[in-house]
Design a protein with these regions (language model features):
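Di-metal (Zn2+ and/or Mg2+/Mn2+) metal-binding site signature of metallo-dependent hydrolases
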Residues: 1-4, 29
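Flexible loop residues that form catalytic
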Residues: 28, 140, 176
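Divalent metal-dependent hydrolysis catalytic cores, especially in the metallo-beta-lactamase
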Residues: 12-33, 134-136
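Extended substrate/RNA-proximal surfaces in nucleic-acid metabolism proteins
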Residues: 35-172
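Functional cores that coordinate and move charged inorganic groups
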Residues: 155-162, 171-192
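Short, acidic/polar
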Residues: 3-15, 153-161, 182
Length: 192
């Protein structure tokens, strides 16, 4: 559910107005949007992981990212966890898309696809695509769709990601998150 004006050109326009230099390309898992990204973005500078709109001389750069929704059962509980995925380039994003599709993901269904896979399985798929990728648990405190969510989450990152926890280098706390509350959870001390 996005605005009909959510196009790369508009994203660049409003980023310039707001003074934002680096933004997410968003939703690289959606096949039509991914095709659009491949046609209209070019890595600049080459090897940086930052992309510019081919048709623009703007300084605004895109990072290659998406968000997915994992809904699955683990330890006799239904889990609902949203994850942000950052890829170092479009080639890695294509490998992630293939890995998800090969495991039955219906990527064309939504910009943020609902996957019947565990958060841990997503980390595996992403790291198989490229070791430089990052998986970041999204809005970690929201009740229904977060790793620490009271209605469907876990009590720790370790409980969710098990032996792959060391690959979780950051969490997205969300705009409504209370920083002083975050600081109380020592598990987050070494995580961005």
């Amino acid at each position: 559910a996005t605005s009909k004006f959510f196009e790369l050109e508009e994203m660049v326009k409003w980023s310039k107005i707001k003074g934002v230099d680096i933004i997410s390309c968003a939703d690289f898992t959606h096949p039509r949007w991914f095709s659009n990204l491949k046609q209209n973005l070019v890595e600049n500078p080459v090897g940086s992981g930052l992309y510019k709109l081919k048709s623009s001389d703007s300084h605004v750069r895109f990072i290659i990212s998406t968000e997915v929704s994992c809904i699955y059962r683990q330890n006799d509980k239904t889990r609902r966890v949203h994850l942000c995925i950052l890829a170092p380039n479009l080639e890695a994003a294509a490998k992630i898309n293939k890995g998800l599709a090969d495991r039955g993901a219906k990527l064309a269904s939504d910009g943020r696809p609902i996957l019947g896979m565990s958060a841990k399985d997503i980390v595996k798929i992403v790291l198989e695509a490229d070791k430089k990728c990052m998986v970041i648990p999204a809005h970690v405190w929201t009740p229904w769709f977060a790793v620490f969510g009271s209605k469907s989450g876990f009590n720790s990152l370790q409980e969710c990601f098990e032996e792959l926890t060391p690959h979780i280098k950051a969490v997205e706390t969300g705009l409504s998150s209370d920083p002083s509350m975050n600081w109380r959870l020592s598990e987050l001390d070494n995580i961005t």
